Amino acid sequence: MKKLFSALIMGAAIFTLGSCSSKNSNYVKIGLLHSLSGTMAISETPVRDAELLAVKEINEAGGVLGKKIKVIEEDGASDPSTFAQKAQKLLSEDKVASVFGCWTSSSRKAVKPVFEQYFGLLWYPVQYEGMEASPNIMYMGASPNQQVIPAVDYCAEKIGKRMYLLGSDYVFPRTANRIIKAQLVQLGGEVVGETYVPMGHSDFSAIIDEIKAEKTAVIINTLNGDSNIAFFKQLGLKGIDSSKIPVMSFSIAEEEVNFIGTDILKGHLVSWNYYETTETAMNEQFVSRYKTEYGNDRFTADPIEAGYIAVHMWAEACKKAGSFDVEAVRVAAKGLSYTAPEGTVTIDGNNQHLYKQVRIGRINENGLIDEIWATPGAVKPDPYLSTYEWARGL
């Protein structure tokens, strides 16, 4: 990994990005790259909205280094190859200073070589499966030790150790479940079933019958996008609610809860680092601003908050560097702390992930999430799970 960092950093001397869009103008360009159409639009559009709110706040406060931010937006269309094409356009044609975007690990992995080739900088706002660290990506979401592992520990202790693993068929669910299976061996638990479905899949009847037949204690859900709508609705039609078989989800937050319906989701569990109900002074301001901008019927959520703070942390790193150049900003971001709605977060200089507090929540009847467990403070990111004996060899 260190060799990769060194090789890519050397590329910065040959291909310096960011400053070329801002030296001779009164604005600096950034790119927003999210799925505004397709199966992932339900989740990614609100993240885009939060990033635009952050841009508005920064511009109203005078901009960054005397320049206003100009947004160039592209639609990844829920397709990894489209994400890669749009990333190349933003970097090589639009010459943006940084890009904020992606959700699925498939889209992130599709754009990763593009950012490394053009020495751009992606600020990635979503929890993921770990096992990665690129000098050209700032990871604003949780690594597995800040979401998945604590959630499985909680379920094993509080609910039961017979777990059914259900996920979309792509990188994050498969890698997360590989981690979970190793963890359950250490916990003395059992995987009673493991199923992956294509993105956008909508028929879960046979899978739910299997879940019931296996006397499952808890379902570990790594479905993404609108498949969650079909799954939870069909779960309810089969007579399964949170009192019978609770579901622990890693990609459902407040926006999805209120789209799917609280009558179906109430009582089920989620694991994140932030909720709309998180009690900090900064969060009160953030929630108020977000609802003022987009309406009281909208909700904040973990990836939304991560997208919001990503833009603000980029701006702070630019100020610290005195430059928009990618390498200068990347170096300035190391060790940077920011008072976020979730609490103070800090960029780990070794892997460009955030220190984050872990919070497990239960969905309530009002469409919000009540925190029921949390770590005492921010947890150091460990994307390669180097501190877990049972994870060696994964």
Feature map (PLM): residue ranges:
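Extracytosolic ligand-binding ectodomains
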Residues: 4-5, 11, 17-394
